[in-house]
């Protein structure tokens, strides 16, 4: 038996005050020291459709924990909506919020001696922030997200009915052929329900990744927020966290702990799945940060290795025609994992919060196997209800059948990939010696090789200006620098630039490169995370208008056609002048300056520099 963390304050005279406060908060004296305290890390807020319903989720989870024999204690973290923060200085705060969320969960659980944890995230930075905290804390933990929203249904001016999502309205804003009335129609219809934005954007990619790494139950990444099966998932997750808490404390079974589950093999599995489904490039940042929190040696080199050997077998929006509900109908994350397993691409001996091995889980949940349970087959029939409402679990709509077509369906088998290269790739060259990332699943084949003159800007705002005023021409490479973790600071997403080039009709004729990030909703030849960043003396700071940029995705290369001697000469000129300073007008708050002071480059997950922190604090 392992002593519960809460035991230290649940007995003895010295902690009578702590117990008095717990009693005042509603904890029964009869339960103190006998039942595990289960922290519920919720992220409800009314700014985000992905989180607007999570207060109701918290109540469901709390009641289920009580019924299962735990003591639920709920608290909230912040949640930044990238779609609302996008395109203005609000986006500077998005990535830094990830680390603050991780701190919040760590602080709350350690300050109050929580025995176990259930996390209720949904949107972009909340999922990785909570994952980082869980891996730091290493107490029994289960994740259950709020779920994806349904895709929209928009009737176009010509009467065509189109499946839409948030990215469609952003494309339309820069398309001069779309009238204000048509734009308003998009605005009203592309986001019909609560939930994280439809499509394989960052939020849904991260919720799928959590399932793949073993810290969430099947369906976590793909059951729609509007479907009644999502409510069932919340109840099952709540019971599971109490179960594994008892396994750890009553049976001393440390296999249920996050660090026992999220091993290097599990990280490799999760990244393999991510590459196969063409997830958001932001997942690269977050999985690197998670690995550091878990003390797992998993680096950009591992991601590069995986991307060379795993094809893309699932292309959901924005890279393809399929929506998240289509991926769910095809078997969801266990469907993708099943195909990867049959191709010998996974470590099947890893375990999860609910199964002793991945092999055992796939036997029950992979819809292509004869052993797949009736429960699994029924769950994967959960379909959109096509009801416009912010309320969750409003319907019980089911597909008539499952999508088992592995040649032309939403999930392909390894012999019929969407593209033979992985959906994500790491590029290197004299422009990014420490690496950069591109979502290959979203790059048209005709521009996998690109060569053209650079148009250089020092901010996202300047990038938007040169796109909308038509300074950016077909054949050019738009270089957006000083937007990295330090240089931004905050490593902004560039969804507006990628959306606007499509709205202008040149999305297949230009390249974009940045030391910042791209949204999970971005597609096209959009290369991000260039390391070292400009503010860290990276070569991208040396580029000038007209320099020839050469990109070859198949060769995994990104270069500027300058010699080492020419780059060295430019570096000397720059350092003799203003140095590595962005030419723009931007106010940076004290909070963002504090983030910038400790931020490492993208190839390290844009995490805080532990060596610098230790040096300045004087603490080990």
From Swiss-Prot:
Iron-sulfur is among the record's keywords: yes
One Pfam family linked to the record: ILV_EDD_C
Reactions catalysed according to its record: (2R)-2,3-dihydroxy-3-methylbutanoate = 3-methyl-2-oxobutanoate + H2O; (2R,3R)-2,3-dihydroxy-3-methylpentanoate = (S)-3-methyl-2-oxopentanoate + H2O
Residues at the catalytic site: 519
Binding site residues for Mg(2+): 82, 124-125, 493
InterPro entries linked: Dihydro-acid_dehy_C, DihydroxyA_deHydtase, DiOHA_6PGluconate_deHydtase_CS, ILV_EDD_C, ILV_EDD_N, IlvD/EDD_N
Enzyme Commission number: 4.2.1.9
Named cofactor requirement(s): [2Fe-2S] cluster; Mg(2+)
UniProt KW Lyase keyword: yes
Source taxon at top rank: Bacteria
Pathway given in the UniProt record: Amino-acid biosynthesis; L-isoleucine biosynthesis; L-isoleucine from 2-oxobutanoate: step 3/4; Amino-acid biosynthesis; L-valine biosynthesis; L-valine from pyruvate: step 3/4
MF terms (GO), sorted A to Z: 2 iron, 2 sulfur cluster binding; dihydroxy-acid dehydratase activity; magnesium ion binding
Keyword vocabulary terms for this entry: 2Fe-2S, Amino-acid biosynthesis, Branched-chain amino acid biosynthesis, Iron, Iron-sulfur, Lyase, Magnesium, Metal-binding
Modified sites of kind N6-carboxylysine: 125
Cofactor descriptive note: Binds 1 [2Fe-2S] cluster per subunit. This cluster acts as a Lewis acid cofactor.
EC top class, as a word: lyase
PROSITE patterns xrefs: ILVD_EDD_1 (PS00886), ILVD_EDD_2 (PS00887)
GO terms under cellular component: cytosol
Family as reported in the entry's similarity comment: Belongs to the IlvD/Edd family.
Function as written in the Swiss-Prot or TrEMBL entry: Functions in the biosynthesis of branched-chain amino acids. Catalyzes the dehydration of (2R,3R)-2,3-dihydroxy-3-methylpentanoate (2,3-dihydroxy-3-methylvalerate) into 2-oxo-3-methylpentanoate (2-oxo-3-methylvalerate) and of (2R)-2,3-dihydroxy-3-methylbutanoate (2,3-dihydroxyisovalerate) into 2-oxo-3-methylbutanoate (2-oxoisovalerate), the penultimate precursor to L-isoleucine and L-valine, respectively.
Protein name listed in UniProt: Dihydroxy-acid dehydratase
Species assigned in the record: Bifidobacterium longum subsp. infantis (strain ATCC 15697 / DSM 20088 / JCM 1222 / NCTC 11817 / S12)
């Amino acid at each position: 038996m392992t002593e519960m963390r809460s035991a230290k304050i649940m007995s003895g005279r010295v902690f009578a005050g702590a117990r008095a406060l717990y009693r005042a908060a509603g904890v029964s004296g009869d339960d103190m020291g006998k039942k595990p305290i289960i922290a519920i890390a919720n992220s409800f807020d009314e700014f985000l459709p992905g989180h607007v319903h999570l207060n109701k989720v918290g109540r469901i989870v709390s009641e289920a924990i009580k019924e299962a024999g735990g003591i639920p204690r709920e608290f909230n973290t912040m949640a930044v909506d990238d779609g609302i923060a996008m395109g203005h200085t609000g986006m500077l705060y998005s990535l830094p919020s990830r680390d603050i969320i991780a701190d919040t969960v760590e602080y709350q659980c350690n300050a109050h001696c929580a025995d176990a944890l259930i996390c209720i995230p949904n949107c972009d930075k909340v999922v990785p922030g909570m994952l980082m905290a869980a891996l730091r804390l290493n107490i029994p933990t289960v994740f259950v997200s709020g779920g994806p929203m349904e895709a929209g249904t928009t009737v176009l001016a010509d009467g065509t009915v189109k499946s839409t999502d948030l990215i469609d309205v952003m494309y339309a804003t820069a398309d001069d052929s779309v009238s204000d009335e048509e734009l308003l129609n998009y605005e009203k219809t592309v986001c019909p329900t609560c939930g994280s934005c439809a499509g394989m954007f960052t939020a849904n990619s991260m919720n799928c990744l959590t399932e793949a790494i073993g810290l969430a139950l099947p369906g976590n990444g793909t059951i729609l927020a509007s479907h009644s099966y999502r409510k069932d998932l919340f109840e099952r997750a709540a019971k599971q966290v109490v179960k594994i808490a008892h396994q750890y404390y009553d049976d001393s079974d440390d296999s249920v702990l996050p660090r026992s589950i999220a091993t290097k093999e599990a990280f490799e599995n999760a990244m393999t799945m991510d590459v196969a489904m063409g997830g958001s490039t932001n997942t690269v940042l977050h999985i690197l940060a998670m690995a550091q929190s878990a003390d797992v040696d998993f680096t950009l080199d591992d991601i590069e290795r995986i991307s060379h050997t795993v094809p893309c077998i699932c292309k959901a929006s924005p890279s393809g025609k399929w929506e998240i509900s289509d991926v769910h109908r095809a078997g969801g994350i266990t469907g993708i994992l099943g195909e990867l397993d049959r191709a010998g691409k996974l470590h099947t001996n890893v375990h999860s919060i609910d199964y002793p091995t991945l092999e055992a889980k796939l036997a029950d949940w992979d819809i292509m196997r004869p052993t797949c349970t009736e429960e699994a087959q029924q769950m994967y029939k959960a379909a959109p209800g096509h009801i416009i409402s912010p309320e969750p679990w409003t319907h019980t709509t089911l597909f008539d059948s499952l999508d088992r077509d592995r040649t032309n369906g939403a999930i392909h088998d390894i012999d019929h990939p969407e593209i033979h290269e992985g959906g994500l790739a790491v590029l290197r060259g004299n422009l990014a010696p420490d690496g950069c990332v591109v979502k290959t699943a979203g790059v048209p084949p005709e521009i996998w090789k690109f060569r053209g003159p650079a148009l250089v800007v020092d901010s996202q705002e300047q990038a938007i200006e040169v796109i909308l005023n038509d300074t950016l021409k077909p054949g050019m490479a738009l270089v957006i620098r000083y937007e990295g973790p330090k240089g931004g600071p905050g490593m902004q997403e560039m969804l507006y630039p990628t959306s606007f080039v499509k709205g202008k009709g040149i999305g297949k004729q230009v390249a974009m490169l940045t030391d910042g990030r791209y949204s999970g909703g971005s597609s096209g030849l959009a290369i991000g995370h260039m390391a070292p960043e400009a503010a860290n003396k990276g070569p991208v700071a040396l580029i000038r208008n007209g320099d020839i940029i050469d990109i070859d995705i198949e060769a995994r290369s990104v270069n500027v056609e300058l010699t080492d001697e020419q780059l060295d000469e430019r570096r000397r000129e720059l350092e003799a002048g203003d140095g590595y300073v962005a030419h723009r007008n931007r106010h940076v708050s004290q909070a963002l300056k504090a983030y910038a002071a400790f931020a490492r480059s993208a190839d390290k997950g844009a995490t805080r520099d532990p060596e610098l922190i230790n040096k300045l604090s004087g603490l080990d």
